[in-house]
């Protein structure tokens, strides 16, 4: 049995409530895993745990020391990478997410770094 991968990839998220809410919403949308940069807030922060409403116990997660390399590895495995970006031409609802996908979300104040956002196949708003 082959499982479709729908990954959420977070870069330097700082607010515990935001991480928890993103994880909870992601689970509702069908993500199969969460990848976070090492400088993302601790997923075991009590505010994160509370705001996930249990999603933290159901969605596999991974912290990486090198998020850029991790994204390159995903792309090498045929995973299509989308980035939430203000310069995106299409609304996220207009894209086709069939097949293995990863969705990049950046820091609350600064968004994605330029280098990571340029690694995406598609920018969406």
Spans of model-derived segments:
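Post-transcriptional modification and biogenesis factors for structured RNAs
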Residues: 1-125
């Amino acid at each position: 049995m082959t499982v479709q991968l729908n990954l959420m990839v977070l870069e330097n998220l700082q607010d515990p409530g935001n991480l928890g809410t993103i994880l909870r919403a992601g689970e509702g949308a069908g993500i199969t895993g969460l990848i976070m940069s090492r400088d993302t807030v601790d997923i075991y922060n009590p505010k994160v745990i509370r705001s996930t409403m249990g999603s933290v116990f159901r969605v596999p997660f991974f912290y990486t020391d090198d998020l850029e390399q991790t994204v390159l590895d995903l792309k090498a495995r045929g995973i299509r990478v989308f980035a939430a970006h203000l310069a995106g031409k299409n609304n996220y609802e207009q894209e086709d997410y069939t097949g293995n996908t990863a969705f990049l979300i950046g820091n609350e104040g600064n968004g994605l770094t330029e280098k990571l956002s340029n690694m995406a196949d598609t920018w969406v708003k």
